[in-house]
Amino acid sequence: ETVKRIAPVFGGINLEDISAPRCFEIEKRLKEELDIPVFHDDQHGTAIVVSAGLLNAVKFVGKKMEDVKIVINGAGSAGISICKLLLEIGVGDVVLVDRQGALAPGEEWMNPAQKEMAEKTNKEQIHGSLAEVMKGKDIFVGVSAPGIVTAEMVSNMADDAIVFAMANPTPEIMPDEAKKGGARVVATGRSDFPNQINNVLVFPGIFRGALDAQATDITEEMKIAAVYAIADIISKEELKEEYIIPGAFDERVAKHVAQAVAKKAVELGVSKL
């Protein structure tokens, strides 16, 4: 109700720090009732920057997004949104894991949002703990808890494994431990390690683009445009293990994202221009 009352004097609304599953319903209702962009940053900002980083990491290790097997640990707002966006950009094999284990149809402990994702993921119907699910996977994405992944768990993943350990301030596994386990590319949410996965790469540009286009919504297609805009900033020649995502203070990012998002808004007809 508060957001609806203040909306007439703003060009867009950025939601922050709303836990799952409430965040899904609140954002859905606001998007239906307002004619300005509404964007829950903890969901979509995280999903966009993770997807951009994974596009480049997968390219660097010589694999393809449609072929990789991914485990996402943490089936809250960020984990579910990351999963949805990865499916949108063509990843075919994702398993979500929460405290009680892998999300799979029939598990009684899941909330409605998790039950929905269980129907769309986990093709092999894997049940069990994070350690069991990680076996043979190409990519680990963590938006969960500190220190829950070991070097041994990473060593059981596929060759040239990619590890995005984004629990803050202490990651699921420290970069040196992940490397010890055989990870080829490691990213965290911290600025004192290479490959920082930070929402600041997303929301300034995505809102600038939406406002420039006078967009009434931020659609899935606009989010995907932002993913590729961020990933494309790093050229094939620049791409390396410790540089798969632009830095948080790279001035090119917001402009590049804004242009891509505004262009897509006009193409989709959600622009008032």
Segments predicted by a language model, with ranges:
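Rossmann-like adenosine-cofactor binding region
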Residues: 115-184, 190-192
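Glycine/serine-rich phosphate-binding loop and adjoining beta1-alpha1 elements at the start
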Residues: 1-68
